[in-house]
Amino acid sequence: MERTHFWELAAPLREPVPVLVAYDAGVAAICQLAARFDEASWGAQTPLPEWRAFELAGHLRCVADDLHEYLDEAPVSRYARLMATGAHPDTLGRKIARQNAAELAALADAPPAAHIAVFEVSARRYAARLGAVWDLPHHQYRDTVVTVGGMAGAACAEWHLHAWDLARTLGVEYRPADPGAVLAGWRAGMPHLPLPDGSPGAKAVRHLDAWHAVLAASGRIPRSAQDSSAVPAWLLRALQPARLRLRRKEKQRQ
């Protein structure tokens, strides 16, 4: 169908309750899994080859803080300005990865459990801010406007994905209680990273499990039998400098 306007909403989350419940469950899952780590397991490698668990704890703290900044400055935040370029997803991924790496390297030295505690407070405070501004624009990617609610959906998906990362690091399985809400959050908040063909909500035949679709869209499992690379090479390169600095800090603490 031909569009008669220059923008559209990204699969809007018209009802806040399901995604906010799933968001809260994602925060809780991260905290519960983090409580199972000890000094040795915090040093274990996560499914993202260039991040160990203690680095992921710091990243979570940074992301929660960034969400507040983006909301404060929406729709002209630095994240909104980046998305407004309409750049290819790979280009956006490289820029976001460099930002993540720089923030992680600059993070104050603290035990991983302390980072998780700050993350929990910040993430829950963010959710409490959303009700009154749910339908307002947060940013735009190409011709798609993402609302504040859509960005909350993206955050919801990120929390569950990182819970999966922590669980796999511990050698246990993880699956959200409401994968459909997580999938809806991804669709609403991540138009620059579309779902794999054949996943629920994609245009092709619907056959993939909702949670597997999110894992595939995020690069954690292959999108297809032909795609065996779970982590893009550009992400590994972007994270390398911060990884080295963080590991020097870790050695200094020992």
Specify the residue positions occupied by each region the protein language model found.
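Flexible "arm" and connector segments at domain edges
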Residues: A97-L104, A127, A163, L170
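Conserved alpha-helical segments that form or flank metal/cofactor-binding pockets of metalloenzymes
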Residues: F54-R98
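Helical hydrophobic small-molecule/effector-binding pocket
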Residues: R94-R98, R125-W134
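HAMP-domain connector/hinge
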Residues: Q45-P49
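A short, structured beta-strand-centered segment in the mid-to-C-terminal lobe
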Residues: G93-V121
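Primarily hydrophobic membrane-targeting regions of prokaryotic envelope proteins
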Residues: V27-I30, W51-L67, Y126, W159-L166
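Structured surface interface patches that mediate subunit assembly and partner/cofactor docking
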Residues: E2-V21, G26, A40-A44, E69-T85, ...
